[in-house]
Amino acid sequence: MQNEYVDMNSSSEDSDGDSILEEGRLRPSFRGQQKERDMLGIFGEEDEDGFHNSGIGSARLRRKNISFVEKSEQVKANKQVTADDLLEAHSIPQLKNKNDEVSQAKNIPKMKFNTTGFGAKMLEKMGYKQGQGLGANAEGIAEPVQSKLRPERVGLGAVRERTEKQRKEAIARGEISDSEDEKHTVKQKPLREKKKKPLKSSEEISKDMGSYNLPRFLASLIDASLNDTKEIEFVTSNKEELGLEGRDMSTSGINQLSRLARVECEHHASAWQQLQARRAYVKMELKRVTTEFDEKSVEISRLEKLLGKVMEVKSRSMEFTVPEAEIDVIEKRLQPLNNLIETLPVEFSEASMHFELDSVAVSILAFVLSEPIKNWDVWKHPYFMLESFLSWKNSLYSKDFRPKREESSTFMDIDVEFDDELEGQSLTHYESFMMFVWKKKIGEELKKWIIQDSLKALQLLEAWDPVVPEKVKDSLIQDDILPRLKDAVSKWNPKLKLKKNDSLHHCIFPWLPYLEKHADSLLQSVLVQFSLILSPWKIKNGSIDDFSVWRSAFANDALDRLLEKVILPKLEKLMDEELVIDPSNQDLEIFFIILSWKGSFKAMVFGQLFADHFFPKWLETLYQWLTEAPNFDEASEWYTWWKSVFPKDLLSNAYIQQGFSKGLDMMNECLENKSITAPLPFAKDSTKGVNLQFSKEKHEFTAESDDTTSYDEPLVSFRELVEEFCAENSLLFVPLRRSHLSTGSALFRISTQASKARGITVYLRNDIIWKKSPGASEDTPYDPIGFNEILLMFNNN
């Protein structure tokens, strides 16, 4: 098709153009074109100049005059041009298929180098020559950069996207061939060639199978497929029947038959190897079972031997059940039993023997000794079978009686450490025997024991102490001894003391060394009982027991604090209210009652008592005597008499000496006719001044003596001590916000958790912890409890 160029500004042939437009109504209005384009979308057929051939929504064409720059042949020939001719001349023909599109893309003119333009002239001035590359050394591109334009309405893949230059470069690089289309340029991985497995000959297969020999005909078939084999030999009894047919067998048939034989032979070889491996395993397993059978047979024979010894001991056990048998006779009959227990680890010491010899020995002892121990008179024969028990303990605690254990292959013998920990937590067989046989008997006898006669019980327990394990001893103390001693402490009443040996310390002190760590619990009960007795105690009844003996038993001056809090205020009140200093008729009953408590307090505390409450009265009486009608002889005798009344150990007290020195100074001032310094007036409200007067002297005395106490310093409250105790032992001390019904004391709960369902309810009174019994009502009297008992209670729970 030949295209013609039209000049829109030409005015020639206007009449012809108008007639053509009016006749054919070629172009629709702009609005109609836009409307129809929106409706048809991509399905509309429109040429590049906007001409539309569809009859849908056709509108009136423009009537502007059109003139042609170069007239067509029909116009030159003065022919009439119709609308169809104009559309045919200026519209793009419809492409029927993709090949037409490709052919159209090939007809697009190629870009050429313009040799007459301004750019070409500038390049020529800079030394560029056509056909060479750019740059000083002509190393740049030699051709212009080309652009590839896809035709309109043509998708990807319809035409080649590369330019001709890019295709040449790709062919030069080897990416595509000259005749290869671009859509087939995807690289493909080369297929992996399978390596052929080398064929084995019959000899190699027979060698792999070990002692198995291939039949001759199979070996011939296998070797037939090898390269150097050209013939096959048939081993058959009827060779004539084969004839020429067997000789003329083709090579392909031979190879196929050989492959079948080879596959079958390889299957046989694999099965043969499996059978050989199974055979070796069966031999090894048979050897293991045989060895294990022999070991078990030896173990069974030794077990039967051990059982025979046990039955022998059982048959002779009737000798120990005779009640008329004497102690010496029974101990002699125990000698074979001792020999048996000593020889057990010797006869059964093999590492393969997993017998628990200690369990066997303890079972024998429990069976044989149950009746003799049941009939044992503990108090009459306290050392019955003691030597035998000592021998049994040494034997059972030796390593020979422990079960034999194979050496562990674990790192650093971790399992051994675990076993040691378990041994520390559980009872051994010997400990179980002593717990349920010996402890049971001793516990029953201790229930009949009189608490005041501690010597027999202590002799019995101390004699058996080397034999009794520590766990059994602790259980005996907690279950049988401590309850009896605490019961005696709670029932102790100093008013009912009839004999000297009825003192509480005569019953308790002998047990303290044996109790060891449990002694604190007992002393706490004693301290509670002292508090219960001293609180209502009347001073005029005299001193209670010998507190100086008890002071050394308590740690942290617990007894001294109790006496200073309960008894000392009563002594001060008695001295202030009832002690009268009368030189004419002196009554010393109150004075001696106060002196009876001298051993209960420390020397400095008791001296402070006289300095604060006795000497103010005594000095006031001496001052009045010397100032009114002085009689130096009588005053001197009265002074000397009072010094003789004081015991010598108390007279050497620094406070007592200071008081008498002040009286002597007053008499010397009177003899020298000097003005006598009046002592501070004594009154109930003036005791503070008296304390201030002697405060400086007190500090001087404390520097001289090592046995001093800071009595004036405030003590820590008992509640603070209880709270500190609970905090140190991870216990909660929680106030309940209610009080006890009878005493009015605040109630608290001591527990390990915040739950109300756990713990004990207590109240504090007179430095004592009072505990509510489990399940008791609110009006039930509370029981005293010590710190150690609280710990034991929560540890057991």
From Swiss-Prot:
Report the domain of life of the source organism. Answer: Eukaryota
A family per Pfam: G-patch
What keywords sit in the KW lines? Cytoplasm, Cytoskeleton
The family database entries (SMART domains) matched by this protein are listed as: G_patch
Q: Where is the composition biased (Basic and acidic residues)?
A: 159-185
Write out the GO biological process terms: mRNA cis splicing, via spliceosome; spliceosomal complex disassembly
Chief site of localization: cytoplasm
Q: Where in the cell is it found?
A: Cytoplasm, Cytoskeleton, Microtubule organizing center, Spindle pole body
Q: List compositional bias (Polar residues) regions by residue number.
A: 1-12
Q: Which GO terms describe its molecular function?
A: RNA binding
One of the record's GO cellular component terms: U2-type post-mRNA release spliceosomal complex
Which residue intervals are annotated with compositional bias (Basic residues) in the record?
186-199
Residue ranges annotated for the G-patch domain, each copy included: 115-161
For this entry, the protein name equals G-patch domain-containing protein C1486.03
Source organism per entry reads Schizosaccharomyces pombe (strain 972 / ATCC 24843)
Which family, according to the similarity comment?
Belongs to the TFP11/STIP family.
**Annotated region (Disordered), positions in chain:** 1-33, 159-204
